[in-house]
Curated annotation (Swiss-Prot):
GO biological process: chromatin remodeling
Name assigned to this protein: Protein mlo2
Gene Ontology molecular-function annotations: ubiquitin protein ligase activity; zinc ion binding
Described function: Not known, interfere with mitotic chromosome segregation when overexpressed.
Amino acid sequence: MEETAHELTVKQYVEQQRELEREAREVLPYSFDTCTYSMGYLKQPLYACLTCQKASGSLNAVCYSCSISCHADHDLVDLFNKRHFRCDCGTTRTHSIPCNLRKSVDECGSENDYNHNFEGRFCICDTVYNPETEEGTMFQCILCEDWFHEKCLQKTNKGIAIPDAETFEWLVCSECSEKYRDHLLNQKHESIAGTERAPLFLSENFRENLCPCESCISLRNLEMPMLVAEEPIYEPPEDSEDGISEMNEDPSESGEMIEQVISSTMNDVLRILDRLPRVQANESVYAYNRLKSELTDFLTPFARENRVVTKEDISNFFLERSRISKNLR
């Protein structure tokens, strides 16, 4: 029988499922099975949970893993990297609901700092960030870690257009340049922030030009260590592909190998889909999970004989399943 647009062998079906799995791994490249709470205070990717804020009345942020494993169906704001922060999942700041990964409720991080970013608002304009409608580039201040619109930076820069993004590596916002002027002394002991309030646009090697005297180094180490050395950023380990079975390329091999791949691939795909962040179709995923066993049993004979699966075969499978379901009511 010649294959049509509606026909495929089980092996081809499995290959299609494996491709979907690879695409899912590209969306979620990191493992999300470990909460960072026990690691203490880190510079790490964070997500503010607005849903838990409404319930607890407290600002919060959760780590990458918890944003997926514990807060996937909540209203989250991507805060990107924030320094010296301990995950708030499973604390009073997230309504004292146990973390799904730690299975516990613990004390919230007393050293965590919060600003208007944790409410979903950014920049001196205090605008709610919407990634779907946001236009233009935003830049993060190396000191306060707030994000600023290019047009707003220009306003604080006496109306002068900011330098091309390719010409600087770091931003110090106008408020921080004024607040931390004494931390930004050059080798002549003059503040690189100048005397007027304005943003600073620093090169990658700006630290080499800061004052090296013992007093200045001590001050920076004590209050602004990010001016001394670039901070390490925690990243979750990459999700391994151990769960992806190797396809048997030899069609003459026993169909049992393909049958095993079907089962393995279905489990892998379901596992990834079930854990995708903020997926709105969870009910469909769970329904598909219940179908796995029946569908595997149905496809096994096709796999063993390397037969094509037609659209009619699949339709008959679901019609029969529907008939049985009605008889059981």
